Amino acid sequence: MSELPADQGVPPAGAANDNGDVRQAEVGGRRREPAPAQPVAARDRPMAAAVEGSMASPVEGPVPEAREGPMAASREGLGAAAREARMAEVARLLAEPAEEEGPEGRPRSRPGNGPGLAALPYLRLRHPLGVLGINYQQFLRHYLEHYPIAPGRIQELEGRRRRFVEACRAREAAFDAEYQRNPQRMDFDILTFSITLTASEIINPLIEELGCDKFISRE
């Protein structure tokens, strides 16, 4: 075997490390080409796929399905209970009588009797006591039976109302008759009454509020 030339020996390690372009020499003068460097992304791709697979595996399992099952069942149960409550309320309203007796004993018409509103029980007008589940006629009968003074009080109020209505009608008839006899006199009386009413209700309180009544003679 021939001896290797001195200039083709193996270079020192320091020189190879300092200059990256210098290729390492082999025996026989042949130079070895460096292996192609793999990209960083190609090296990291298998590791990233393994990490993603390990993270995605517990989520895709049967755990979410088992977790969503009780929640869906509870929501369905609440919806069914609400529907049953609404149906019970509608049935209770439909079971109520369509007519009620008024204070005079004659039936009281209700808007729910019409064909158009028969299917809408919530639009029927109800007595305030009906909201509390109290029948108005039974409540009134119980009140009249246990409080003997109530019938007398009611009759007294009815008498006062009747007398007031009769007096108003009599005054209206007298006013019409007087106007037919002397229209000019009635017009003057109406004007005088209007001025007097305005002075008593507006002008006099304003004078007292401003303090001008001290300078006005009260004679």
Curated annotation (Swiss-Prot):
Record text about domains: The N-terminal portion of EID2 is required for nuclear localization.
Presence of keyword Repressor: yes
Modified residues (Omega-N-methylarginine): 75
Keyword Transcription in annotation: yes
Gene: EID2
Role this protein plays: Interacts with EP300 and acts as a repressor of MYOD-dependent transcription and muscle differentiation. Inhibits EP300 histone acetyltransferase activity. Acts as a repressor of TGFB/SMAD transcriptional responses. May act as a repressor of the TGFB/SMAD3-dependent signaling by selectively blocking formation of TGFB-induced SMAD3-SMAD4 complex.
Oligomer status and interactors: Heterodimer with EID2B. Interacts with the C-terminus of EP300. Interacts with HDAC1 and HDAC2. Interacts with SMAD2, SMAD4 and with the MH2 domain of SMAD3.
Protein name per Swiss-Prot or TrEMBL: EP300-interacting inhibitor of differentiation 2
Location of region: Disordered: 1-71, 95-115
Superkingdom per UniProt: Eukaryota
Keywords: Developmental protein, Differentiation, Methylation, Myogenesis, Nucleus, Repressor, Transcription, Transcription regulation
GO cellular component: nucleoplasm
InterPro entries named in the record: EID
Gene Ontology MF terms: transcription corepressor activity
Ranges annotated as biased composition (Basic and acidic residues): 20-34
Gene Ontology BP, a term: negative regulation of DNA-templated transcription
Protein location: Nucleus
Principal location class: nucleus
